[in-house]
Amino acid sequence: MRIADYSVTKAVLERHGFTFKKSFGQNFLTDTNILQKIVDTAEIDDQVNVIEIGPGIGALTEFLAERAAQVMAFEIDHRLVPILADTLRDFDNVTVVNEDILKVDLAQHIQNFKNPDLPIKVVANLPYYITTPILMHLIESGIPFCEFVVMMQKEVADRISAQPNTKAYGSLSIAVQYYMTAKVAFIVPRTVFVPAPNVDSAILKMVRRPEPAVAVEDENFFFKVSKASFTHRRKTLWNNLTGYFGKTEEVKDKLTKALDQAGLSPSVRGEALSLAEFAGLADALKGQGL
């Protein structure tokens, strides 16, 4: 029997008198086939260390611990710590850290792996209400995670993996794809969770690029420009950028020159631009002193 078997999950929750906290976005997976697929998608073996976020009662952790060198699981809910100590008692390669992943000194914790030089993968069922902040925090942490295989709301997975000229494409697509390749591995129906969420989920596989997707003079400025370009999706690049930089004649003159230099029409919308085109635009705007 597995932790994720519905009868086991139910028994564990009842034994410990556990009640779900909506504020933590807790939805526990009760489908062993899907858990197996997640671990297979992540290609976990004994030459990999794993960071897990939000282990719950250890359903995914169990599958990870059977294959990984070590698993470090970050759980914000202190009520789950004794439950995890119970459900994962047979594993000596799991460490549960009762901390908020957004506040913890992750670099310090990673040194506690027995072999911190092994590649590190992030495999997690992320809380829906805080998926994007957690992902961006980890991607921008400077820690060389080689891969992420994470469950999230399907709509967010679609946005992250979206290509130009699609409805889902936006500043989040650019922010993630600058660092990683991103592809939806498979869809997870809402019916396999306790309690069932209101939406379907997706497993997103992201692999770190050896170098960022495009070369830019100023990364922060590049992200600001891409974000500003999507402020109002239905507006043109010109309208969004004058809304961001200002509408003085000087700004308009510089903006005209930058767009011309980048080979872009003022009437194009942000969703039509590739990462390379955003890079060219950001560098041209920077060159104009904007």
Swiss-Prot record:
- Residues recorded as binding S-adenosyl-L-methionine, renumbered to this chain, are 27, 29, 54, 75, 100, 125
Q: Which GO terms describe its cellular component?
A: cytosol
Lineage, opening ranks: Bacteria, Bacillati, Bacillota, Bacilli, Lactobacillales
Report the InterPro entries cross-referenced here: KsgA/Erm, rRNA_Ade_diMease-like_C, rRNA_Ade_Mease_Trfase_CS, rRNA_Ade_methylase_Trfase_N, rRNA_adenine_dimethylase, SAM-dependent_MTases_sf
Provide the species name.
Streptococcus pneumoniae serotype 4 (strain ATCC BAA-334 / TIGR4)
PROSITE patterns for the chain: RRNA_A_DIMETH (PS01131), SAM_RNA_A_N6_MT (PS51689)
Tell me where it mainly resides.
cytoplasm
Can you say what this protein is called?
Ribosomal RNA small subunit methyltransferase A
Q: Does the keyword rRNA processing apply?
A: yes
Record's catalysed reaction(s): adenosine(1518)/adenosine(1519) in 16S rRNA + 4 S-adenosyl-L-methionine = N(6)-dimethyladenosine(1518)/N(6)-dimethyladenosine(1519) in 16S rRNA + 4 S-adenosyl-L-homocysteine + 4 H(+)
> Which GO MF terms does the UniProt record name?
16S rRNA (adenine(1518)-N(6)/adenine(1519)-N(6))-dimethyltransferase activity; RNA binding
Report the EC code(s) recorded for this entry.
2.1.1.182
The Swiss-Prot or TrEMBL record describes its family as follows: Belongs to the class I-like SAM-binding methyltransferase superfamily. rRNA adenine N(6)-methyltransferase family. RsmA subfamily.
